[in-house]
Amino acid sequence: MEVHISDDEKLFLISGVEQDIRNDGRTCADFRTIVLERGVLSGTNGSCRVQLGQTTDVLAGIKLELESFDPAAEKEAKQPMSFHVDFSANASSQFAGKGGDQYGEEISAAFQVAFSRSLDILPNLSKTLLAEGYRWKINVDLSVLQWAGSVPDACSLAIIGALSDLEVPEVEVAPDDGGKVSIVLKRPRTGGNMRDEEVPVAMWKLDVQSCPMLLTVSKIGSANLVDCSPEEECCIRSQLLIGVAKNLNVDDYDITCIKQHGGGLLEMESIQDMTELASKTAGGLYQAIEKRLKTEEKRKPGHSFLL
Amino acid sequence: MSIISEHGFRMDGRRPAQIRNINTRLGLNRNAEGSCYLEHGNTKVLCAVYGPYESKASKRLEDRCAIVCQYSTTTFSGLERKNRPRGDRKSTEISRLLEKAFESVILTESFPRSQIDIFCEVIQGDGSNLAACVNATSLALADAGIPMKGIASAATCGIVETKPIVDLTSREETDLLPRVTLATICGRDEVILVELQNRLHIDHLSVVMDAAKATCADVYECLAVVAQQHLKACAPILGN
C-alpha cells in the first residue's frame, strides 16, 4: 500500500509529534493495540500471529530440523535459529513477485544479528545442542500478511510468541558404532497398556523472558517515535533498527543490534536518545508479553484463527 | 495403511464422497478491494484481490482486462519446510492455471486496458491446495464486486480401487493415487479448469469426473451461502 500525503499534512504530522501528540492520539513512545495469538497452526512446532493496530498482520511459524554440523569448522557454537521474513503479495501489490524480497532480506539479516548471541542470552537455548555434531535447528519463518507500518516490531513480537509456543522433543543420545551417536526420542512410560510408539514424546519449552526483540525507532522532525503508522513512515528522516535484550543478571537491557535503515542523516547524540527510547519501550513490551503469555487461554489445535 | 478402511471410512473419519468443513471470512484485508480467508479442514488459504486498476503498458490489453495471479505458500505450510515461498515450477504452474481459469469467469470485456491482481497465499497446506485457492479467489472476487459469470467452485478427487474419493488431504495425495482437480461455474456443466496428476486408467476417468462434478456442485452450495450471508451483512452499509 503506497501512501500519498500532501506537504501540509506532513507539516501537521511533524509539528504534532514534536509536541508529543500523534494523529491517532498516541504519544511518541506508545504502541498501537497488540493482538497476540499462539498455537494457530497445527502443522508447525510453534506458531504465533501478531496484529498491530488491527492492520499490520504477521504470522510466524517454526519448524524444527535435526541438523548435523562439523564441530571442528565452528570456532564457537553457532546459535541454532535462522530467520526468514517473507512479504506476502496479499499485504500490498507492490510486494508481488520479487517486490518484497529486498526489504524481507534486510529485516531477516537484522534479526540474525540481533539473535547472534542468543546462546548467551536465552538461559536454556544451549539444550538444543544434542551431541557433538548434532543440534536442533530452529527455522523461524515469518509471513507478513497485512502491512501498515512497523513490520520489524510486529515480527519480533511474533518471534517471541512463537518461541514460547515452541515445543522441542526430548531425546536420548547414546554412543553408536564408529564414533557416531544414535538419537532417539524420549518416551517416558507412565504405565497403562500402550505400545512403545504410542507413548507421547516428552517435550520441553524455551525460556523466552530475555528473548531479544528488534524495535524500529524513527526520527520525525526532532522527535523520536516507536511503532510508526504508514503516514508517519512517509515523514521519517532516519530510522534505526535497534535490537534489545533483557539482561536477567542486572535487571537492565542490552543492545544487541543497531542498524540504520532507509538512509538519512543522524547526529551522534540522537543515536543515544533513540537507543534509550528503545530500551524504555522494550521494558514495557516485555511486561506486556509476560502478562499475555501467562493469561492466554490454551486453544485446541487447529482452531480457525482468522475467523 | 489403506486409504479407505474395511468399514468404508477414510483416515480422518470421512466417507468417500464427503468434503471437509469449509470455513470462510470475507473482507479482512483493508488494503485490498476484496479478500477472503478460507479453510478446507486443515488447508488454510488467504486470497486478496487488487483492482481493476489501470494496468502497466507491458500488460495492457486494448479489449479486455489482464488477470495477474500469484500463488505462493508459506515456507512452513507443508510437512517439510520449503526454502522459497514462490517462484518454483509448481507454484508458477498453479499461478498460470488460476489465471487462465479466472480469465474465463470474470467478464473481462467490462474493463478494457485495466488489470486485476489475484494473490493467493497458502498458510497451511493439507491437500487440495489448488481447489482451495480457486474457492477462495471466487469469494474474494465476489467481495471485490467484480462482475463474473458466476461463482466458481473447485474440488480435488482421487480414485482408490475403482471408488472415487473427494477433497483429498495431504496424506491421501500420494504419488500413486491419480487425482483430478476440476473447477466449474455455479456447479453447472461449465468447466473452467481441469488438471490430472499421476496415471489414470481411461475407464476410471468418467467415474472421477462425475464425482468431481458433483463435489464442485456441493462446494458451490457452501460458497453461495457464504456470499449471500456476506451481502446481507453488508446491506446496512450499502443503504438498502
UniProtKB/Swiss-Prot annotation, chain B:
The keyword Cytoplasm applies. Keywords: Cytoplasm, Exosome, Nucleus, RNA-binding, rRNA processing. GO terms for molecular function: RNA binding. Its main location: cytoplasm. It is found in: Cytoplasm; Nucleus, Nucleolus; Nucleus; Nucleus, Nucleoplasm. The keyword Chloroplast does not apply. GO terms for cellular component: cytoplasmic exosome (RNase complex); nuclear exosome (RNase complex); nucleolus; nucleoplasm. InterPro entries: ExoRNase_PH_dom1, ExoRNase_PH_dom2, ExoRNase_PH_dom2_sf, PNPase/RNase_PH_dom_sf, Ribosomal_Su5_D2-typ_SF, RNase_PH, RNase_PH_CS. One of its GO terms (biological process) is rRNA processing. Signal peptide: none annotated. Component of the RNA exosome complex. Belongs to the RNase PH family. Non-catalytic component of the RNA exosome complex which has 3'->5' exoribonuclease activity and participates in a multitude of cellular RNA processing and degradation events. This is Putative exosome complex component RRP41. It comes from Caenorhabditis briggsae. The gene is exos-4.1.
